[in-house]
């Protein structure tokens, strides 16, 4: 949990405050962003990108399923690069539903989900179709998709809560398009991306070491218990 909090704090600080601690700041007038460098813009996601939803081919029509076209569900959106999918559809399924093929680099956001799913994002590593619970975000030339991806990672809790207002349980295109994003100049976006890639790789390495240590402890504990209950170890106190 501490590593997750560290990761979230690292991303949030980089995409809202930048890497230069000496620049003057101003109020962004956005709840999740707070203050931003004075020379940055703050724009709605809908202004910076084209946002679309997908669809689901008729489940009752077997000719629409088990084809060659990857089809993404919200459960597969989990802050990763999507390189494969659990299900695939056919050309007929694509033609006879609201989905379409989004290009690699497109950001997908999960709009539905009562658990932790709603508000999560991922980046397509392959051309893929997707269901109506996903929003496909194709960035304009003024922003880098990976920078926007990190912004949406940072805004996860804020975005998730947008789906809780009044009786609105899920997100929709209107809500997603109004999300505010801090926009530094392109060069700074590149610098922030490089910085985050390097720092997150370090955190990943630490997380892997911790996971390996926990696994080793569990193995040794299991081996000790087995040895104790089978009489291989004398647990009686020595006289």
Language model regions located:
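A short glycine-rich beta-alpha junction/loop motif
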Residues: 27, 127-135, 165-190
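Short beta-strand/loop turn elements enriched in aromatics
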Residues: 9, 62-80
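Non-catalytic DNA-recognition/assembly elements of restriction-modification systems
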Residues: 28-55, 178-186, 190, 198-201, ...
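Short amphipathic coiled-coil heptad-repeat segments
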Residues: 1-38, 209-239
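A generic structural signal for residues embedded in beta-strands
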Residues: 109-110
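Sequence-specific dsDNA recognition surfaces
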Residues: 28-29, 46-60, 75-104, 130
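Short, Lys/Arg- and Gly-enriched loop/turn segments at beta-strand edges
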Residues: 116-123
């Amino acid at each position: 949990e501490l590593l997750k909090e560290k990761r979230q704090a690292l991303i949030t600080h980089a995409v809202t405050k930048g890497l230069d601690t000496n620049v003057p700041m101003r109020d962004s007038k956005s709840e999740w962003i707070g203050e931003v460098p004075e020379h940055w813009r703050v724009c709605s996601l809908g202004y910076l990108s084209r946002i679309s939803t997908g669809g689901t081919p008729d489940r009752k029509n077997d000719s629409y399923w088990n084809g060659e076209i990857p089809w993404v569900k919200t459960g597969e959106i989990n802050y990763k690069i999507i390189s494969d999918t659990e299900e695939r559809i056919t050309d007929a399924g694509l033609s006879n539903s609201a989905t379409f093929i989004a290009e690699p680099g497109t950001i997908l956001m999960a709009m539905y989900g009562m658990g932790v799913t709603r508000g999560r994002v991922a980046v397509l590593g392959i051309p893929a179709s997707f269901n109506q619970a996903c929003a496909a975000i194709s960035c304009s030339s003024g922003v880098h998709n990976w920078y926007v991806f990190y912004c949406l990672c940072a805004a996860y809790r804020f975005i998730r809560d947008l789906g809780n207002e009044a009786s609105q349980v899920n997100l929709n295109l209107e809500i997603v398009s109004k999300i505010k994003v801090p926009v530094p100049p392109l060069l700074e976006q590149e610098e922030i991306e490089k910085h985050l890639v390097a720092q997150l790789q370090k955190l990943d390495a630490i997380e892997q070491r911790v996971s390996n240590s926990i696994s080793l402890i569990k193995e040794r504990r299991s081996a000790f218990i087995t040895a104790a209950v089978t009489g291989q170890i004398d647990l009686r106190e020595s006289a």
